[in-house]
Amino acid sequence: YSLTGAQYTHISLAFDEDLSTLYSSTRKNGYTMFPAGPSREYLNRGVFLMRENIPCALYALEVTDEAYTRAKRRTQHMMHHGELYRFNSLGLLLCWMHIRWQRRRHYFCSQFVSEVLQKSGALELPKPSTLMHPSDYAELPELRCLYRGTLAGLPQRQSMELGEVESVMGLYLNVLLGAVKGRVRRLF
């Protein structure tokens, strides 16, 4: 937000109106930039708790049942097989400089959303996914704006029970436990 000057600097997908779970390629622990990759986000936890006065917009896209199913299936696959995917740090920098660069299984947030929407047949984009910025979505005529304001004012967030801001020690402990669980699962 303060670095790029753009009004919106992050984008996520949701498959339900209450926004209980958001999906993106972003920070995995909710606080620090790395580790990053395909992640589930929750409006009542992590960085969303710490930055509640940032600009926020909610858009709806009407899609066919088939496109919805394909988008959800693709997203769930990427979440379930998160170890196969990485955050596209270099691609993010190049996108900011308007340079197209594709890496297999590497995504930044708007590239992730763009790929899911495009490959599911839900939306045709005006430019390649590697050049889509979060703020570009505000300009797409297919999207209907449902809310524009601060994150704290988002109606779906106001109805949620807010979690506590975790300490950094607790955060890294949770990340470490998640990594250990992930390794154990792969052994069986």
Which residues make up each language-model segment?
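Cysteine-nucleophile amide-bond enzymes
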Residues: 1-188
